[in-house]
Amino acid sequence: SLSVVLTIVYVAFILYETLMFRESGDARTNFVLFSYAERFLTEQSVRVGVINNIWLFVPLGAGLYRIIQKKWVLLVPFLMSVAIETTQYITGLGIAEFDDVFGNTMGGWIGVLTAWAWLSRKMSVKNRT
């Protein structure tokens, strides 16, 4: 179906964005969750980074909601983000960060909830007519 194709294309886009624009170097990590919290209000670059981590996974969550079993839909964004951060760590591409996993997972969940709300409303309107 179109939902499957679009979701696969979007997964490829995420992988491209998170892995292909990085220079290989020494593996760097930041395993402190919410390490940017103090600087979030004062540094625009930190805000942009956090927001980008969230919005990047919103379409993924929405697509997944339509194509996989509902019991897995909240787990997949988390697992994909962990896989990306692990790849970044192993290859030295970028910085492997817990904050990225958290933001990506939240974005995926926002996408799932948005798709659920939109499709529930659509079905409700359809049933009324």
Segments from the language model and where they lie:
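Bulky hydrophobic segments
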Residues: 1-98, 109-129
